[in-house]
Design a protein with these regions (language model features):
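Interfacial loop-to-transmembrane junctions
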Residues: 21-28, 211-235
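Structural signature of hydrophobic alpha-helical transmembrane segments
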Residues: 1-8, 44-56, 195-202
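Cytoplasmic-side transmembrane-helix entry/capping segments in multi-pass membrane proteins
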Residues: 23-32, 50-52, 71-84
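Long, highly hydrophobic alpha-helical transmembrane signal-anchor segments
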Residues: 67-141
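Alpha-helical transmembrane segments
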Residues: 6, 46-55, 113-130, 190
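N-terminal signal-anchor/start-transfer transmembrane helix
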Residues: 2-20
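Alpha-helical transmembrane segments of helical membrane proteins, especially in multi-pass transport
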Residues: 178-209
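Juxtamembrane boundary at the C-terminal end of a transmembrane helix
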Residues: 240-249
Length: 249
């Protein structure tokens, strides 16, 4: 349950600061986090664990940015720390056993999948939407040559849209929209056991992108952008699918 809560709070926070203005995002993020924590407590999440999750999610929001062409203030370090936190929380969730919260008995007794699996599927889906883009961009900024970084924004500015800073990330049309849809599709097909269809999606993406990449000339930046971004995006989708599958066992 704690893993699902962490992914959900981070996912909701990133969606809010991407699509809302600064003031609205500053109000929406704590409200959404409180709602997610309350729901988790009602189905049996330990209060101390929920408090730790809120701290971890806050650290993520303070060390990352959803601004498309702004250099991530924390680089890839927040993503690495998040992976470690997810592994630890997954182990804690597995050791905790069946949830015992006020809403757990009726939910567990239903014909639906286990509540832990349902919660993790929702949390992973929210995370893959915008937080996946955050990690992909952090990997691209690390791997591709960049201009001098812009001054580090104040923490409150990371919750809102800003004018893009000067950056040299190659532009592949529709990447910010296609990426989340692709991750959700791959994760869903993997969970459904349709590995062949998931592979077809990956192949189709390469075919569709080939004309745009081939016009890149001799620099090869778009090809590297496509390769690095795709591999990171696919790894996130498969990782989330694995977490959901494990939660059902």
């Amino acid at each position: 349950m704690l893993t699902a809560l962490l992914l959900a709070v981070i996912g909701l926070g990133d969606l809010a600061r991407t699509h809302l203005r600064r003031r609205a995002a500053l109000l929406a993020v704590p409200v959404l986090a409180a709602a997610a924590v309350t729901a988790a407590l009602l189905v049996g999440a330990p209060p101390l664990g929920a408090a730790i999750v809120v701290v971890l999610a806050g650290a993520w929001l303070l060390t990352t940015t959803t601004v498309e062409n702004a250099r991530p203030p924390g680089g890839l370090r927040p993503a690495v720390a998040l992976v470690a936190a997810v592994l630890v929380l997954t182990a804690v969730d597995r050791a905790a056993g069946v949830p015992t919260g006020p809403l757990a008995p009726t939910t567990v007794a239903s014909t639906l999948p286990p509540i832990e699996q349902l919660a993790l599927a929702v949390g992973a889906g929210l995370f893959l939407l915008e937080s996946g883009n955050v990690i992909v961009r952090a990997a691209l900024f690390r791997e591709l040559p960049q201009a001098e970084p812009a001054p580090r924004p104040r923490w409150s500015e990371r919750f809102a849209r800003r004018e893009p800073a000067d950056a040299r990330l190659p532009d592949l049309q529709g990447g910010r929209t296609i990426g989340p849809l692709e991750r959700l599709l791959i994760a869903g097909l993997t969970l459904a056991g349709a590995i062949g269809l998931a592979g077809a999606v990956l192949a189709a993406k390469g075919i569709v992108r080939f004309p745009e990449i081939s016009r890149d000339g001799g620099s090869g930046e778009k090809a590297e952008y496509f390769l690095v971004g795709s591999l990171v995006s696919w790894a996130l989708a498969l990782g989330c699918a694995g977490l959901v599958a494990i939660a059902g066992r």
